[in-house]
């Protein structure tokens, strides 16, 4: 049992590796334990804490130390322990059969049995006498905490309770106490740590106090008393910041990162041997157990020494080495030679070599076991471990694997010999290193063959094969035997049962593969299906574009079989080929994988050259796999697609605007240089000598109007808009105005594409450092609504920006436009001044404004060819998921505006899911029927009928299908029309709400500006009047010598001067107020003008969408009305035509024509009089039905006779 002085748990979260007793001899990932940031161990139970404050426990529960309602002897898998609802756990401790947790509010809860034979606390119970608890530690039968003590000079003290047989409570006597008692230390307590039967504490100044059982001299090496009840200092001036206590010794860490151990333990330390141990690097954490110690350096190295009977040290040692004692410095420096593996005790530290290079977060030792919390790795670790990374949770494969896969999509999928030809070894090593370290970098500099090699290398170097060794041994031979049976059957061509045997074998192969996949661990299964789906993509692309040497399913199976099946085996590639072939069947069993794969494709492939590839892929797979067709229309899929389209569209627009701004800035700089050359004799250039077009953006901002008493000029408004607002305007933390961003898994897009865009952004940023580019954007406000777009970073968490523009490593866009302050603050001030108390109650009902100066529409110029091309591709993407009833162009146009208000994002997604792609009726059905009727009437001879029979049948079937669907379609669109109206009008209402709010704010601020200007003019007038009076008084010469008159004049002068000075101060204050109000007005005006086009576009969109749905319903009603009159005539002509020529066709023995007629008429009968009898009775009279049935009987008899 190990106890550590732990004040607050603020460690990063990772996976748990264990080694030693009951574990393997080397550090091994423990998949049963969730991601944790801290753990502690009692005698036979353990507690673990996550970074979100959730508590887990496992082990012995006979004393309810796991807080389980049932006294289960042992719990093997971690269970979640709820201390109190809606409260996070901040720190934990367990010892003996007792557990404790400090909550985030500083209260302490305990459960279990603290004192042997004492009362058992079955559920977490608050310790009432303690508040402000910061640290807790538990021994065998006693507990110690650091808590607030406001009535003492120290203000924070150590409190103990439990048994005191060995003096561990810090008071005289051996009584048992159940109530916390304060221990007198004389200084403010920082942390506390319990050994089995003693207690240690660190106080202010990093001094150590120890008390309790001293048999091993761990309390005081020069005191032979077995029990020391009064706290004593074992030494002075050691600067101790962390303690770890066990049964008979204490380990301590100093502030400079050295370790000191004292007490008596022949495997770790000896009495009197309390010198500091120096390590190659500074130590940041220690953990001591009964017989060994682990320490962690700042570089992530683990050093250990002590007993290694159960391989708990896990390192190699030279058994002949011994510590080197430096007598001059008083320190011990053990040697670090490693030659052989040993299980003997050693006082020499060495590193745990199996974890070299891993990012170790914390270490733990207990009993004869060791553990470490480690950041989940990528390469050469279990798949289950790598999927514990934050960026992999909820994904079908590790992030780096998905990046490689997406890089190989598109044009790279056509590379000849992909996965067969090798890449550069040096590039592959570099690529693996960068992926393993989670570096964000452009992958385009690597060849497709390099990425393909890394995929194979990753699968090959997994600790065990993807399909697991155990399952490979169980299924591989059986499946291969069935394949051999097929080969033997095919070689024996004389056997008439070959086909049946092969079918039986294939069924058995399919069943075995499905059973195999079902038994795989979840992470392995998801990665396998993701890989099979990708290999199927590569196979299709290779066969389509590589006529020779294409990497089809067979060739890919040959390459991948050694990497995912039994290693070293050959001839098992047929199994992988079968798995690729069975992908549609596999997807039916695991439809969620289809969702995850499409989401991944939508996030990564809807940009650049991969857009046509993914469109073609989605069209193909939706035809091949029903699961893909179903997934593509799910709300979360549509939401992901829309998010990706908006982000990429705004990204492209932003890059183009940046390029245009850069060119404009360069031209402006050239103009300024020319102007400077023309005015070399002038030391100062007045702003009035330069036109606004020749001023750089920075100069426009620095030049101020000579008088603020007048309204700002357009150029001044531009200088105050966009760019300045981006840094001065900030959305308040008030819920009414705080922006909430949509989440999407746009993880590190820099790694795979848009290299050129990123480089352009970087160049633009560098070029714009010397001059503010905001004026260029601002100038567009007065010219057109085509503004610089807001690039919204949508990461895994909601973001709220205030102040300066933040930087994000997850976004491929370097500049995030930030809205803030003036407009919104002004609005808030108005709400505050109005004394409204309902803001908090209504905050959730008010929309939040995301962007201020973003592009209200995608307007294209000759220079935006890339955007035009991309937009056309996006329209094709939307056409895959949205109904053609609504114009896709209108949707693309409104997208940037929709994402201006975060409240509308969800509404817009709901709207799109409502109008998702459903079957539509032919818009010119009545005209088509009329054309077919004319064609039937033109057929006079049997030869003509034979030539057109197939086309006639298909057209009749198509007309019947559309005709019967008209009623269903009308019903569907009338049902969804209110929802469409609700969502679209609600979107418009939010925009109108913001528009009205901004307009109102602008009006009120304009009134404030007028009043401020009026006040300023009034003060100026008053000052001028006083100055005139003073000048007049000064000009009057008094010829009298009367002292009283002279003194009165001086007094009048003094009064006027003071009044003028007072008035000047008021003018200065008024001028500042006028400047502020003027700036707010310009900001709100800019915001208003930027938002106005968005409202117009949204209003236009809502009008179009409502009108489109209404017109479509009207069109359906018209089609229904027209076809009710035309279809009977058309269908009767079709029947009469067949009656006219069927006898001649029979005589000519046109068996194919008779079969075609029989099949078509049977299908028509099924549609009209079986499946849709209720609808068809409105279109077909009883007489026509009788005639059709007669025709059916005749054609079927002809078919029977012909056979």
UniProtKB/Swiss-Prot annotation:
Residues at the site labelled Arginine finger: 420
- The Rho-GAP domain is annotated at 381-594
GO MF annotation, one:
GTPase activator activity
User: Which spans of this chain does the record mark as coiled coil?
Assistant: 649-679, 995-1078
Cellular localization per UniProt: Cytoplasm
* RCC1 repeat spans: 52-104, 106-148, 155-204, 206-255, 257-298, 299-359, 361-410
Q: Which GO terms describe its cellular component?
A: cytoplasm
Identify the Gene3D superfamilies for this entry: Regulator of chromosome condensation 1/beta-lactamase-inhibitor protein II (2.130.10.30), Rho GTPase activation protein (1.10.555.10)
Write out the biased-composition intervals (Low complexity). 320-343, 746-788, 833-852
Keywords of this entry: Coiled coil, Cytoplasm, GTPase activation, Repeat
InterPro entries assigned to the protein according to its UniProt record, in alphabetical order: RCC1/BLIP-II (IPR009091), Reg_chr_condens (IPR000408), Rho_GTPase_activation_prot (IPR008936), RhoGAP_dom (IPR000198), Ub_ligase/GEF_domain (IPR051210)
Q: Which GO terms describe its biological process?
A: signal transduction
Transmembrane segments annotated in the record for this chain: none
The UniProt entry lists the main location of this chain as cytoplasm
One Pfam family hit: RCC1_2
Task: Tell me where on the tree of life, at the top rank, the source sits.
Answer: Eukaryota
Stretch list, region Disordered: 316-343, 657-725, 746-789, 831-852
Matching PANTHER family? REGULATOR OF CHROMOSOME CONDENSATION (PTHR22870), REGULATOR OF CHROMOSOME CONDENSATION DOMAIN-CONTAINING PROTEIN (PTHR22870:SF446)
Job of this protein: Rho GTPase-activating protein involved in the signal transduction pathway.
This chain belongs to which protein, by name? Rho GTPase-activating protein gacGG
Question: Which organism does this record belong to?
Answer: Dictyostelium discoideum
Gene for this protein? gacGG
